[in-house]
């Protein structure tokens, strides 16, 4: 899975690109002048996530399938925890928790193992977890929130 940026990304967008790709055990690449076909070639037959900007900050995630078809997009503001500075990403695929349309879209896109909300406490301490709520998506590692996307909109295509 490839995570990439808009054409001229800000430092914050590049940071989110790196964090998200490490968290989901994917690859990160700065887009530059590449068009969609070139990005799909770099994705090597896998899905693609493009991080868009709003006023110089990361503000949208667009999720594309292997053929380059836009499946859904999220608008958001981001937040980072101080815990992130000392966190080591294990490269293990995270688990997915949450209910609703966004959680279902994530399940179909990522194919991550789904965990019921009442079973989160039973996961091993080193687990990574994406918790999809009504208003946010929390990316957690070792039981702590590492970064969060505060949702502003969701659109399915």
Swiss-Prot record:
Residue ranges occupied by any Brix domain in the UniProt entry: 1-157
Cross-referenced SMART domains: Brix
Keywords per UniProt: Ribosome biogenesis
Presence of the UniProt keyword Electron transport in the record: no
Database matches in HAMAP family: BriX
UniProt function note: Probably involved in the biogenesis of the ribosome.
Matches recorded under NCBIfam families: PRK00933.1-3
Name of the protein: Probable Brix domain-containing ribosomal biogenesis protein
Native organism: Methanosarcina barkeri (strain Fusaro / DSM 804)
């Amino acid at each position: 899975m490839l995570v990439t940026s808009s054409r001229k990304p800000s430092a914050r967008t590049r940071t989110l690109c790196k964090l998200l790709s490490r968290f989901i055990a994917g690859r990160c690449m700065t887009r530059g002048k590449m068009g969609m076909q070139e990005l799909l070639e770099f994705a090597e037959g896998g899905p693609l996530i493009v991080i868009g900007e709003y006023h110089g900050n990361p503000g949208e995630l667009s999720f594309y399938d292997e053929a380059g078809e836009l499946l859904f997009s999220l608008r958001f503001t981001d937040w980072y925890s101080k815990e992130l500075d000392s966190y080591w990403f294990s490269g293990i695929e995270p688990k997915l928790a949450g209910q609703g349309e966004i959680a279902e879209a994530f399940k179909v896109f990522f194919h991550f193992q789904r965990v019921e909300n009442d079973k989160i406490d039973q996961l091993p301490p080193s687990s990574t977890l994406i918790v999809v709520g009504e208003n946010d998506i929390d990316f957690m590692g070792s039981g702590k929130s590492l970064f969060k996307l505060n949702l502003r909109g969701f659109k399915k295509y």
